[in-house]
A protein has these predicted regions:
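A bilobed periplasmic-binding-protein/Venus flytrap-type ligand-binding module shared by bacterial periplasmic
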Residues: 136-141, 176-180, 259-271, 279, ...
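C-terminal capping/gating helix-and-loop segments adjacent to ligand/active sites or protein-protein/ligand interfaces
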Residues: 289-350
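Extracytoplasmic ligand-binding site segments that recognize negatively charged/polar headgroups
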Residues: 78-84, 88-207, 211-217
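Ligand-binding "clamshell"
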Residues: 88-95, 119-123, 238-250, 313
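Early extracytoplasmic/lumenal segment of secretory-pathway proteins
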Residues: 24-87
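A ligand-binding cleft/hinge motif common to bilobed small-molecule-binding domains
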Residues: 83-88, 221, 227-244
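Periplasmic-binding protein-like
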Residues: 41, 158-169, 192-202, 241-266, 281-305
Length: 350
């Protein structure tokens, strides 16, 4: 995949990254999604501290939480908001000092409406990146008309050529949208049952439940998968390789948008000041283009996104769209447990 070093300019940046190539900063451990060690987003951090942070990676939120709750020590973690209630209940995180977050005043207050994200105790989660889960498809082999509805996942024509995210939130957002539900905030038992029934009809068509963006990109590039419920990043990987991939974010039922962000780990092993150096580096306007280019995700800092031309945002599928959007907000822990358990049963054929 094309990376972002060409965006970096200036002798200071070049020297900083030359030093970083030899050693990671031991005073900051970042626990992040695979693929998120993006050099262009770390320029301000490296210029100030001389080296990139120490990175450790995870594949999904469940894996990340299990690791930190079992004793793994990190300074900052990059979960999506659905995982935040578990971090709080386990006493693993502490509120952010928002006065040290340079972009904080620019962030949309609507992102902080959940009591799990912000309450009287402070801000527990800093929203950072957002993207979509929508229909990725092979432009050569799948007619555009076939992907105008989520029912494509039930189409026998694509049996065994479909892949769906092995992520409970993504899967249930898909199933709820397909059955006419656009939020899980007040979902009923009947609506859960209807969504589960829809998923059970889809499951026999699924060749793989993908868990890694590069894995999905490889399966689509090989022709093994023709239609997928995908994040932006597999599409970005395929487009960087000039593969003919489409990404329909506006089927008739809608698509889903998710955002992820940062939690400040209590008793992290590194230096707290460097946690904020890293956060500010990620929010920096100079970081937006490298992240969009590398993995196709947008930055919730409007000043950062303003640095990216509209046509480039459209090409990366991070421009605003006019469609029904199922926003993946934090859900009640008891609902999450129920949906995770039901999803495991569905994947197992029950």
């Amino acid at each position: 995949m094309t990376r972002t070093l060409r965006i970096l300019t200036g002798a200071v940046s070049a020297l900083a990254f030359a030093a970083a190539a030899h050693a990671a900063d031991p005073e900051l451990t970042v626990f992040d999604w695979a693929g998120w060690e993006i050099d262009g987003a770390l320029t301000p951090y490296v210029e100030k501290n001389g080296a990139k942070p120490t990175y450790v990676f995870f594949a999904d939120d469940d894996e990340a939480f299990q690791k930190v709750s079992s004793g793994f020590k990190a300074d900052v973690v990059h979960p999506c908001p659905g995982a935040v209630p578990r971090y709080r209940e386990a006493g693993l995180i502490e509120p952010w000092d928002t006065s040290k977050v340079e972009a904080f005043a620019k962030l949309d207050p609507k992102l902080f409406e959940s009591k799990f994200i912000k309450d009287d105790g402070g801000v527990w989660f800093l929203p950072f990146d957002f993207a979509y889960t929508a229909i990725a498809y092979n432009l050569n082999d799948v007619p555009e008309g076939d992907v105008q509805s989520l029912e494509v996942f039930k189409d026998p024509k694509y049996a065994g050529r479909i892949s769906i995210s092995d992520n409970s939130d993504d899967v249930w957002a898909l199933a709820f949208l397909a059955t006419g539900v656009t939020s899980w905030d007040d979902v009923t038992d009947e609506q859960v049952d209807a969504a589960a029934a829809w998923l059970r009809e889809v499951a026999p068509n699924v060749r793989s439940w993908w868990s890694d963006p590069s894995e999905l990109a490889q399966m689509m590039a090989s022709g093994e998968i023709l239609v997928a419920w995908s994040w932006n990043d597999p599409v970005a990987i395929l487009k960087a390789d000039n593969f003919p991939v489409g990404f329909n974010r506006a089927p008739k039922e809608g698509s889903t948008s998710f955002f992820c962000g940062f939690v400040n780990m209590k008793d992290g092993p590194g230096k707290e000041d460097k946690v904020y150096d890293w956060v500010n580096s990620m929010y920096a306007p100079s970081s937006a283009a490298p992240i969009v280019e590398a993995i196709g995700y947008a930055n919730v800092n409007p000043d950062a996104m303003a640095t990216i031309p509209e046509d480039a945002q459209k090409a990366a599928f991070v421009d605003k769209i006019d469609t029904t959007l199922f926003l993946q907000t934090p859900m009640k822990p008891e609902l999450r447990d129920r949906l995770v358990e039901e999803f495991e049963l569905i994947k197992s054929g029950f």
